[in-house]
UniProtKB/Swiss-Prot annotation:
Tissue localization of expression: Detected in fetal spinal cord and in brain neurons, with higher levels in brain from Alzheimer disease patients (at protein level). Highly expressed in heart, brain, placenta, pancreas, lymph node, thymus and prostate. Detected at lower levels in lung, skeletal muscle, kidney, testis, uterus, small intestine, colon, spleen, bone marrow and fetal liver. Very low levels were found in adult liver and peripheral blood leukocytes.
Topology, Cytoplasmic side: 371-655
Gene3D superfamilies attached to this UniProt entry: Death Domain, Fas, Tumor Necrosis Factor Receptor, subunit A, domain 2
GO cellular component: plasma membrane
Location of the protein in the cell: Cell membrane
BP GO terms, sorted: adaptive immune response; apoptotic process; axonal fasciculation; B cell apoptotic process; cellular response to tumor necrosis factor; humoral immune response; myelination; negative regulation of B cell proliferation
Main location: membrane
Role: Promotes apoptosis, possibly via a pathway that involves the activation of NF-kappa-B. Can also promote apoptosis mediated by BAX and by the release of cytochrome c from the mitochondria into the cytoplasm. Trophic-factor deprivation triggers the cleavage of surface APP by beta-secretase to release sAPP-beta which is further cleaved to release an N-terminal fragment of APP (N-APP). Negatively regulates oligodendrocyte survival, maturation and myelination.
Descriptive protein name: Tumor necrosis factor receptor superfamily member 21
Subunit structure: Associates with TRADD. Interacts with NGFR. Interacts with CASP8. (Microbial infection) Interacts with hepatitis C virus (HCV) non-structural protein 5A; this interaction allows the modulation by the virus of JNK, p38 MAPK, STAT3, and Akt signaling pathways in a DR6-dependent manner.
Lipidation (S-palmitoyl cysteine): C368
Family matches, as InterPro entries: DEATH-like_dom_sf, Death_dom, TNFR/NGFR_Cys_rich_reg, TNFR_21, TNFRSF21_death, TNFRSF21_N
Signal sequence extent: 1-41
Length: 655
């Protein structure tokens, strides 16, 4: 029997699903295996990196042995031999070691903390004693001083710490401080409106707002018939709401009558108290307890208060002998609302106005810099390097001759152009080096590629353009770019050129010539071999001979990989470590202080007891390192190399 088309389609789809599931499972298993292998390899790598070693001279055999360092908190009580491992012992009381080491004695802890300082860290096997000031005090001139107390009206702007004093500031508008304190900030005024209260007395920088209750009339029992709310006219006059339209003497009678026409009616209806006497005569004799609040009224409005009294009294008469369950609220009286639209004070807004102005100036500078840079990048150097130098000389103080002579090293009466030397060696790598030096775009690289025929011409033009684009171009940056692209052979050629006794062969420094105006015109020389090379036979002036070549960090960078040779002019003082290299290390250490103890621990086996005593007497760690350079530098090249390796391993920023 034949199969139907629908069944064949279903079988095909099932097979595709099965294949996808199988592929997914295989990929998942491979990922799991890769993850497990990575996680198992990491502990092994960490374990191998945790173990440090040191070198020890066996006094019995005179051999230099490599021993494992002791962990932190211990010291080497017995060094290793050919048949035994080193023995570590715990640091005794009063001593410590922070790192793994190969020393024979732990470091002494610092002196006990002088009064009133307290111990922040105790003296232990792993840590030195650290002192600090107690709470409420800060360190000032090697002693502790109490934090400043902010007076009344002032609050804490910045809390004090162990090393800084308290900073106070005057309470701003809307805040106050009523107690002197060294920890409290200014507090905000009490919000009377949120508590259904009014401000009776506004706050100041030293006091809070004084709030009061709203005026209200409350009665425990309703007035009985025949009993007036105000039994005497004097009482009514005492508690009568005063009016802002008070009629002084000398006012005409019509105005006074019209202003008082309302109150006589109210008083007469109250004072007469002629209410029909029903069966509640006994209750009429009962006393009526009334509470009339004594308020401080600030502003009074005549119209609303009088209308309130007219509405209030008839309601009291109508509810004769019944108790009033609803309190009678009076008009809202309180402190007048402060005027929100006050005069503009320039002193209050001056700080943020200055900040906005500085931000505006910064934005303008950034925009102008970006536009100038974009115009420079768009132009693209399609002309020869000599024209580039001439155009750059119109805008900069440095002339083309000065810029060219900056990269020329004079040796035996001949001027050797460093840029030509590098251009002749890098070949097609000039693109990567040029992009690394000045972040050039593909368009600029293409301009050099299309403008010249040979790679050394393109490289020389690109390097000259790099030196013209910014005055910060230096030999140190060029060497860094060469090392970045693994051209240490070119760096060694430059290094050999700068050495006094090393002479480079002329044919190795020769740069192929072309009819293009690439090479600067050298001074004629009778030697035909020098005419076809990149050597410039320019006799330097006495000033040029005396001044250094590239006054920057170029020379330490050239010699950071090893100690200088014994024939170098920089090592003629008997030291295997050049002065420039030592000064570079010490300058970096003084700029960025760090823990130098591991370096001293690594070099202990090279020092005799007298040298160790001399170094221990020096108080500053940087001066100790300087003295260590002087001592180790004259011992041997192996000791000098060990010191440099230790410095570069513990201070990686120097690389």
């Amino acid at each position: 029997m034949g199969t139907s088309p629908s069944s064949s389609t279903a079988l095909a789809s099932c097979s595709r699903i099965a294949r996808r599931a199988t592929a997914t499972m295989i990929a998942g298993s491979l990922l799991l295996l890769g993850f497990l292998s990575t996680t198992t390899a990491q502990p092994e790598q960490k374990a191998s990196n945790l173990i440090g070693t040191y070198r020890h001279v066996d006094r019995a055999t005179g051999q230099v042995l490599t021993c494992d360092k002791c962990p932190a908190g211990t010291y080497v009580s017995e060094h290793c031999t050919n048949t035994s491992l080193r023995v570590c012992s715990s640091c005794p009381v009063g001593t410590f070691t922070r790192h793994e080491n190969g020393i024979e004695k732990c470091h002494d802890c610092s002196q006990p903390c002088p009064w009133p300082m307290i111990e922040k860290l105790p003296c232990a096997a792993l840590t030195d004693r650290e002192c600090t000031c107690p709470p409420g005090m800060f360190q000032s001139n090697a002693t502790c001083a109490p934090h400043t107390v902010c007076p009344v009206g002032w609050g804490v702007r910045k809390k004090g710490t162990e090393t800084e004093d308290v900073r106070c500031k005057q309470c701003a508008r809307g805040t106050f401080s009523d107690v002197p304190s060294s920890v409290m900030k200014c507090k905000a005024y009490t919000d009377c409106l949120s508590q259904n209260l009014v401000v009776i007395k506004p706050g100041t920088k030293e006091t809070d707002n004084v709030c009061g209750t709203l005026p209200s009339f409350s009665s425990s029992t309703s007035p009985s018939p025949g009993t007036a709310i105000f039994p005497r006219p004097e009482h009514m006059e005492t508690h009568e709401v005063p009016s802002s339209t008070y009629v002084p003497k000398g006012m005409n009678s019509t105005e006074s009558n019209s202003s008082a026409s309302v109150r006589p009616k109210v008083l007469s209806s109250i004072q007469e108290g002629t209410v029909p006497d029903n069966t509640s005569s006994a209750r009429g004799k009962e006393d009526v307890n009334k509470t009339l609040p004594n308020l401080q009224v600030v502003n009074h409005q005549q119209g609303p208060h009088h209308r309130h009294i007219l509405k209030l009294l008839p309601s009291m008469e109508a509810t004769g002998g019944e108790k009033s369950s609803t309190p009678i609220k009076g008009p809202k009286r309180g402190h007048p609302r402060q005027n929100l639209h006050k005069h503009f004070d320039i002193n209050e807004h001056l700080p943020w106005m200055i900040v906005l102005f500085l931000l505006l100036v910064l934005v303008v500078i950034v925009v102008c810099s970006i536009r100038k840079s974009s115009r420079t990048l768009k132009k693209g150097p399609r002309q020869d390097p000599s024209a580039i130098v001439e155009k750059a000389g119109l805008k900069k103080s440095m002339t083309p001759t000065q810029n060219r002579e900056k990269w020329i090293y004079y040796c035996n009466g001949h001027g050797i152009d460093i840029l030509k030397l590098v251009a002749a060696q890098v070949g097609s790598q000039w693109k990567d080096i040029y992009q690394f030096l000045c972040n050039a775009s593909e368009r600029e690289v293409a301009a050099f590629s299309n403008g010249y025929t040979a790679d050394h011409e393109r490289a020389y033009a690109a390097l000259q353009h790099w030196t013209i684009r910014g005055p910060e171009a230096s030999l140190a940056q060029l060497i860094s770019a060469l090392r970045q692209h693994r051209r240490n052979d070119v760096v060694e050629k430059i290094r050999g050129l700068m050495e006094d006794t090393t002479q480079l062969e002329t044919d190795k420094l020769a740069l192929p010539m072309s009819p293009s105006p690439l090479s600067p015109s050298p001074i004629p020389s009778p030697n035909a071999k020098l005419e076809n090379s990149a050597l410039l036979t320019v006799e330097p002036s006495p000033q040029d001979k005396n001044k250094g070549f590239f006054v920057d960090e170029s020379e330490p960078l050239l010699r950071c990989d090893s100690t200088s040779s014994g024939s170098s002019a920089l090592s003629r003082n008997g030291s295997f470590i050049t002065k420039e290299k030592k000064d570079t290390v010490l300058r970096q250490v003084r700029l960025d202080p760090c823990d130098l103890q591991p370096i001293f621990d690594d070099m202990l086996h090279f020092l005799n007891p007298e040298e160790l005593r001399v170094i221990e007497e020096i108080p500053q760690a940087e001066d100790k390192l300087d003295r260590l350079f002087e001592i180790i530098g004259v011992k041997s090249q192996e000791a000098s190399q060990t010191l440099l390796d230790s410095v570069y391993s513990h201070l990686p920023d120097l690389l």
